[in-house]
Design a protein with these regions (language model features):
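N-terminal intrinsically disordered/low-complexity leader segments
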Residues: 1-39, 223-236
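Generic hydrophobic, amphipathic alpha-helix propensity
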Residues: 37-48, 65, 90-98
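Helix-turn-helix
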Residues: 51, 55-85, 89
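Alpha-helical DNA-contacting segments of helix-turn-helix folds
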Residues: 52, 87-97, 101, 154, ...
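Amphipathic alpha-helical segments used for helix-helix packing
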Residues: 127-148, 163, 191-197
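Hydrophobic/aromatic-rich alpha-helical bundle segments in the mid-to-C-terminal region
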Residues: 168-215, 222-236
Length: 236
């Protein structure tokens, strides 16, 4: 028994080292990265985003992204387990940009909360139309369930932004979990836009309008058609 254990000792140490190495690699993918590593990862993201202007999401591969980015395939698979992980990372980046677009102050004069909804909604539409990658990852027919789930999370944040933007100009009623109403309204717009992508292969004006109408109609179940306006000095 003792002799057998001594013979197995080196093998056990090798297995342990391999396991520790795998753990370190996993941590490196999500936590530690050198300057050149950050640059290569960003290059992969930028290349994937550029490729999605002309390539369907279903046809994207991590190997091809790495080749076009001139990043070693081994490095690409060090950063991302597969193309789905790359797309999820790109989706997170795009969602942050999308949210900043919605957060930008409204410079137009608005007369109703519905007008604020329309202005913000069309900001989002313009963002999607100007970035095919954003469009494919959010409402494209090839978007995976994981990407769709990420888009719902993005809608949660966007719903809070809509609530805040309207609250800048109008006195909204006190409703428990009020931002959730805007999240649900935005989910309705996403459904209309997804149908547009499925039927027409692009975002069409008809479905844009249908989405906006659906969102406002839903919100008007809970929010009065007319809200008290805030005085300019009361703007947040």
């Amino acid at each position: 028994m003792g002799v057998a254990m001594r013979r197995m000792g080196p093998k056990l140490k090798q297995v342990k080292r391999r396991r520790e190495g795998s753990s370190i690699t996993s941590q490196a993918k999500g936590v530690r990265m050198s300057g050149p590593g950050v640059a290569r990862r960003q290059l992969l993201l930028n290349t994937a985003r550029k490729m999605l202007r002309t390539t369907r999401l279903a046809e994207l591969s991590l190997g091809e992204v790495a080749r076009r980015a001139k990043v070693g395939k081994g490095s690409a698979y060090f950063f991302y387990d597969d193309v789905n992980a790359l797309c999820a990372s790109l989706k997170g980046l795009i969602d942050n940009e999308f949210q900043e677009v919605l957060r930008a102050p409204l410079t137009q004069s608005v007369s109703s909360w519905q007008e604020v909804i329309r202005l913000l909604y069309h900001r989002g539409i313009a963002f999607l139309e100007n970035d095919p990658a954003a469009c494919q990852l959010a409402i494209g027919v090839d978007a995976s369930p994981a990407l769709k789930l990420m888009d719902r999370a993005n809608d949660v944040v966007a719903g809070r932004i809509f609530d805040e933007q309207i609250s800048q100009r109008f006195v909204l009623p006190i409703i428990p979990d009020r931002p959730k109403l805007f999240f649900r309204a935005l989910s309705l717009t996403d459904m209309m836009l997804s149908i547009s992508m499925l039927e027409r292969g692009k975002i069409t004006p008809e479905y844009v309008e249908e989405g906006c109408r659906a969102a406002i109609a839903y919100l008007q179940i809970y929010i009065p058609e007319k809200l008290p306006r805030k005085k300019p000095e009361e703007f947040d």
